[in-house]
């Protein structure tokens, strides 16, 4: 029949992650396949807040999200994105022997700012020669259409 794939050889899987013994397509597996090596996240603090912190929705933050618990050093005076990346990469390279990194905008809601502020921050992170992508921590109610468009500008086809 036209358009059908050829039959698989014995022991061959339709999905390469199955051949690796995985039960699902893990993001780590995808990154290793795409870049040929380990890719590690570098946590960045761009100084964002959250509608549950600044009073727009509530005050005091969410009960499940205490940024101090997972990034205590990041809530101190901030370095530039470039300096945070350089510092984080230096630490992670020795710990994980990684050479490629995701810029992880971690604490708070990292789409909770005007597009004019977001774009240069994301561009600065992607300009680093060892950064291969972005990971952006946010809330689903803080990604309006204009933020979708900005994020779409950074996608790789």
Predicted regions and their residues:
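Core AdoMet radical
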Residues: 68-88, 92-115, 130-143, 157
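Broad structural signal for hydrophobic residues in well-ordered alpha-helices, predominantly aliphatic
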Residues: 31, 92, 125, 151-154
């Amino acid at each position: 029949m036209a358009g059908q794939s050829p039959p698989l050889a014995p022991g061959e899987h339709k999905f390469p992650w199955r051949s690796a013994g995985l039960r699902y397509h893990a993001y780590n597996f995808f990154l290793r396949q795409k870049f040929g090596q380990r890719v590690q996240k570098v946590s960045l603090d761009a100084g964002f807040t959250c509608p549950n912190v600044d009073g727009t929705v509530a005050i005091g933050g969410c009960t499940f999200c205490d940024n101090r618990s997972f990034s205590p050093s990041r809530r101190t005076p901030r370095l530039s994105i470039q300096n945070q990346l350089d510092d984080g990469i230096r630490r992670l390279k020795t710990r994980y022997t990684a050479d490629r990194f995701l810029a992880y905008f971690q604490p708070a809601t990292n789409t909770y700012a005007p597009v004019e502020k977001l774009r240069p921050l994301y561009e600065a992170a992607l300009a680093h020669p060892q950064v291969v992508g972005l990971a952006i921590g946010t809330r689903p109610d803080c990604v309006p259409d204009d933020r979708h468009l900005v994020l779409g500008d950074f996608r790789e086809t």
